[in-house]
Amino acid sequence: MTTTAPAPQVYGGDEVATLVIDTGSSYTRVGYAGEDTPKLVVSTECGLMADEDVEMEDDTSNTTKKLNKYKVGDSANLPLPNMEVLHPLTDGIVADWDAVQNIWEYSLARLNADTKTHPLMLTEPCWNTQANKLKALEIAFESLEVPASYLVKDAVASAFAAGKGNALVLDVGSEVASVTPVIDGLVLYKPARRSQYAGDYLDRQIKKVLVSRGIDLTPRFEIKNKKAVEMGEPPVFTKRELPNVTHSFTDLQVSRILSEFKDSMCQVNDVPLTPEISGEAADRVFEFPTGYSTTFGADRLSTSESLFKPSEYPFDGETVPDTARGLSEMVVDTINASNVDVRAHLANNIVITGGGSLVQGLSDRVSKDVTQALSGLKVRVAAASNQEERRHGAWIGGSVLGSLGSFHQLWVSKQEWQEKGGDYLVEKKRFK
């Protein structure tokens, strides 16, 4: 984490640091504008205790009970009895505001931030709903009591993080992969594309392969002890006795294994895989929490190929429509659907961001595919080599924007909120 001081903003005659929150499907990033990386990154997936399992004093307030009911941060990774794991976002937008508000409040408390003195910048996807915009501002002004707030499109923020006012942003998140054109800092909505074939989808492909090979995916929290075994030998381990741990918690911990595999093992072939071109990948060894280890070669490529040709990698009992578009196809579709006057700008400024984009070879493959499909345009891809910059692109862009003095005029003040109301601000003024 960076140790540089937050960049101050002049607000109400005083210099204060802007708070920036980027709420993603898997992780929420919180920090101060002007810094290089977020101060805090917490899981957006949080725990929910049943009312009868919430411990509290007799005189505990309803607010404290509500906070105890939700388990956020490290406590969400504890195998607590009867704790269900919530996924507060659906299709990349907030569906459970109680959970998200708890995540924000927990994170800001960890920062010891006095929200009454800091403007708050929040990121949002370009397909966010009007109702969600209103709710985000309501929490900012009514619950957190911030003096000013602003909702910035995550694609715009990612473009600014890459130093671009014009860009075509390919964001591969956990739930959603999206392609968004940005011209002069504004989103072009009509040509934008998104799909569900993103990080979580790749995790499912990985799980399908591992299960087909008979690999035990027992998560770490269930393992009491294990013995070292030779590569390829069956694991030898003892399970913990943990009564009343929910399936949703176990599923979350298994997903952590799949994410580790994805980050360290998966690779995108430089050309599309076909029956004639199976691709070659050097064998790599992966050790599972049980102690079992084995090598993976071709599977490292075939799982990742699903991001580019999802219709060819269906799951049992499910049908992927033939019209499902892969990452490169969405980029090409978006450029072709954009006004002819901006296509060259977009093709020459493709920004790739998001944790799901860190699969080895993904950026090169997108570049080659798009160059081949759009031979009349000069294609240039920008993808941060630093993993943290790629994972936190939208937050970093929000940090850049929040530290600009020229951005000050765009803030919505609490006074405006109180005098004109959220409906006016959302529908008619700033955030439509």
Swiss-Prot record:
Gene Ontology cellular component list: NuA4 histone acetyltransferase complex; SWI/SNF complex
Domain of life: Eukaryota
SUPFAM superfamilies in UniProt: Actin-like ATPase domain
Any GO molecular function: chromatin binding
Keyword field: Activator, Chromatin regulator, DNA damage, DNA repair, Nucleus, Transcription, Transcription regulation
Any one GO biological process: chromatin remodeling
Transmembrane segments: none
Locations listed in the record: Nucleus
PROSITE patterns: ACTINS_ACT_LIKE (PS01132)
Predominant place of localization: nucleus
Family annotation (InterPro entries): Actin (IPR004000), Actin/actin-like_CS (IPR020902), ATPase_NBD (IPR043129)
Database matches in CDD domains: ASKHA_NBD_Arp4_ACTL6-like
Protein family: Belongs to the actin family. ARP4 subfamily.
Function noted in UniProt: Chromatin interaction component of the NuA4 histone acetyltransferase complex which is involved in transcriptional activation of selected genes principally by acetylation of nucleosomal histone H4 and H2A. The NuA4 complex is also involved in DNA repair. Is required for NuA4 complex integrity. Component of the SWR1 complex which mediates the ATP-dependent exchange of histone H2A for the H2A variant HZT1 leading to transcriptional regulation of selected genes by chromatin remodeling. Component of the INO80 complex which remodels chromatin by shifting nucleosomes and is involved in DNA repair.
Subunit architecture: Component of the NuA4 histone acetyltransferase complex, of the INO80 chromatin remodeling complex, and of the SWR1 chromatin remodeling complex.
Name used for this protein in its record: Actin-related protein 4
Species name: Yarrowia lipolytica (strain CLIB 122 / E 150) (Yeast)
Taxonomy of the source species: Eukaryota, Fungi, Dikarya, Ascomycota, Saccharomycotina
